[in-house]
């Protein structure tokens, strides 16, 4: 299978990098500090959601802003302690792309996303974070904004995601979707193509755009 595109849009956590251990470590500490019970915390989905949404599910509205700032500090500080690592295939795939043909689209704040990306040497020309949008994934706004930043028709963009909410955002934006089974089982992911991770793919830049193929 070969997919043709003009731009590639990547989620970050679970797609380009792994930060799951850091997320669990920092949020568990945060929950203890804010008196969130283990039962309440266990019932909340963390992956693929903004901190504002998560905290809003757990604390009164008047405590959200301060609590979000606290968990952001915890997560940013954890980056220096090895809280992020590249996932297989990330470096080779990004190195094969022109800088103006790809973007990172994440539910993290700009400060946290920049820290994680910088830690592994990824410096996208276009970066869309929770701070740049009013509605996060699964709403299409983040991916539509990335397409505008790159000057590419959404219909010619391909979204790479590991989370159902992100894949839903890509579909709603009218984009082709590629799911990576890094944090969810393949059968849980609704996408045009499902692969294990980015190492399963190869890209070739042509005069007409970018060709994405499954290796082997």
Language-model segment annotations:
Residues 29-32, 104, 200:
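Intrinsic disorder/low-complexity segments enriched in polar/charged and small flexible residues
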Residues 17, 41, 83, 103, ...:
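A generic secondary-structure micro-motif detector
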Residues 18, 104-106, 179:
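Hydrophobic residues in well-ordered beta-strands that form the structural core
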Residues 1-5, 91, 95, 99, ...:
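Asp-based, Mg2+/Mn2+-dependent phosphohydrolase catalytic module
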Residues 27, 102, 160:
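Aromatic/pi-system hotspot detector in well-structured domains
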Residues 79-84, 105, 135, 172-173:
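Short, flexible loop segments at the rims of nucleotide/cofactor-binding pockets, characterized by
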Residues 2-98, 109-111:
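N-terminal helical cap/lid subdomain that shapes the substrate entry/recognition surface
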């Amino acid at each position: 299978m070969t997919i043709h595109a003009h731009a590639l849009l990547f989620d970050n956590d679970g797609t380009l990098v792994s930060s799951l251990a850091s997320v669990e470590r920092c949020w568990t500490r945060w929950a203890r500090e804010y008196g969130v019970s283990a039962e309440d915390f266990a019932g909340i989905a963390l992956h693929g959601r903004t901190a504002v949404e998560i905290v809003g599910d757990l604390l009164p509205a008047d405590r959200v802003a301060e609590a979000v700032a606290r968990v952001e500090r915890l997560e940013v500080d954890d980056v220096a302690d090895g809280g992020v690592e590249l996932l297989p295939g990330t470096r080779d795939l990004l190195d094969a792309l022109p800088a103006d043909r790809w973007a990172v689209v994440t539910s993290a704040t700009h400060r946290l996303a920049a820290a994680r990306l910088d830690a592994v040497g990824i410096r996208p020309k276009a970066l869309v974070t929770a701070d740049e949008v009013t509605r996060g994934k699964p709403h299409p706004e983040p991916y539509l904004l990335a397409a505008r930043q790159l000057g590419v028709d959404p219909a010619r963009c391909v979204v790479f995601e590991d989370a159902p909410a992100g894949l839903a955002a890509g579909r709603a934006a009218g984009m082709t979707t590629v799911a990576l089974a890094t944090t969810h089982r393949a059968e849980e992911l609704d996408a045009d193509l499902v692969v294990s991770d980015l190492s399963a793919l190869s890209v070739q830049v042509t005069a007409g755009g970018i060709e994405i193929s499954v290796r082997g």
